[in-house]
């Protein structure tokens, strides 16, 4: 008589774990790597710009070379060229931060203005007081000769009044001229804006370079600016009105 040998029972298969729908969680090692590298690149770029500004203050644009900036930071010139295509671009972007702060300062000054003329008056006072309070920064922006660089090489958006201080001044001059009955063309707006810009730059640069000149007594700076701008506005509007009357005749 034969007896069947009982078959061995198969081990139960492990149950599959349910997988939730949606993307897999990020791998910390992978996700933080690029971000860390970006931060390092940003920090290194800022070190190069700071070094360029330091050299500008010491010896002007002629003191700024790719080699000199590399030596200041302790890197090779290849690293500098990796961020900036040439010396002109490097110097331009080294000064961009000052120009943006300056533009923001002017923009804040006109927020409480009650008229186009008041806006122009406020921005003129803000321009001069900023320059005289920050002479080193002002020298870098407007008194230190720099190699020309294409607009697209700047980090400032051309024509954006929040970053481009001249664009703000031009818009304010245009707003003032728009109060006149006669139509105003772009050439007239541009000429008036440049006259205003050169006027406030003139008083600022003189205050910075020779404010202690003993040969004449200067008016308090705000009083000086306000009087000057009122005369400018009166003369400009009179000239526009006279030109309109002549053209009608």
Go through each PLM region and give its residues.
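Hydrophobic/aromatic-rich alpha-helical bundle segments in the mid-to-C-terminal region
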Residues: 151-159, 163, 176-230, 239-249
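Short, flexible, mixed-charge acidic loops at enzyme active sites
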Residues: 26, 142-145, 208-212
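Short amphipathic alpha-helical elements of helix-turn-helix/winged-helix folds
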Residues: 51-55, 130
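Generic hydrophobic, amphipathic alpha-helix propensity
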Residues: 41-52, 69, 94-98, 102, ...
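Helix-turn-helix
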Residues: 47, 55-89, 93
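N-terminal intrinsically disordered/low-complexity leader segments
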Residues: 1-43, 54, 240-249
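Hydrophobic alpha-helical connector segments
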Residues: 93, 107-137, 160-166, 186-196
């Amino acid at each position: 008589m034969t007896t069947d040998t009982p078959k061995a029972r198969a081990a139960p298969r492990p149950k599959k774990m349910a997988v939730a729908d949606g993307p897999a969680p990020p791998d910390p090692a992978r996700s933080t790597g690029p971000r860390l590298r970006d931060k390092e690149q940003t920090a290194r770029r800022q070190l190069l710009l700071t070094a360029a500004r330091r050299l500008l203050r010491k010896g002007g644009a002629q003191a700024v070379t790719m080699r000199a900036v590399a030596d200041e930071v302790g890197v090779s010139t290849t690293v500098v060229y990796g961020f900036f295509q040439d010396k002109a671009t490097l110097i331009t972007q080294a000064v961009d931060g000052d120009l943006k702060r300056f533009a923001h300062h002017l923009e804040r000054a006109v927020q409480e203005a009650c008229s186009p003329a008041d806006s122009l008056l406020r921005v003129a006072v803000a321009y001069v007081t900023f320059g005289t309070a920050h002479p080193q920064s002002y020298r870098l922006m407007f008194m230190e000769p720099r190699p020309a660089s294409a607009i697209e090489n700047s980090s400032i958006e051309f024509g954006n009044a929040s970053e481009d201080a001249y664009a703000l001044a031009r818009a304010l001059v245009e707003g003032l001229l728009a109060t006149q009955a006669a139509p105003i063309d772009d050439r007239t707006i541009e000429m008036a804006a440049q006259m205003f810009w050169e006027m406030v730059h003139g008083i600022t640069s003189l205050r910075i370079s020779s404010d202690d000149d003993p040969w004449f007594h200067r008016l308090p700076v705000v009083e000086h600016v306000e009087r000057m701008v009122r005369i400018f506005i009166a003369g400009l509007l009179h000239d526009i009105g006279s030109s309109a009357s002549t053209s009608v005749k």
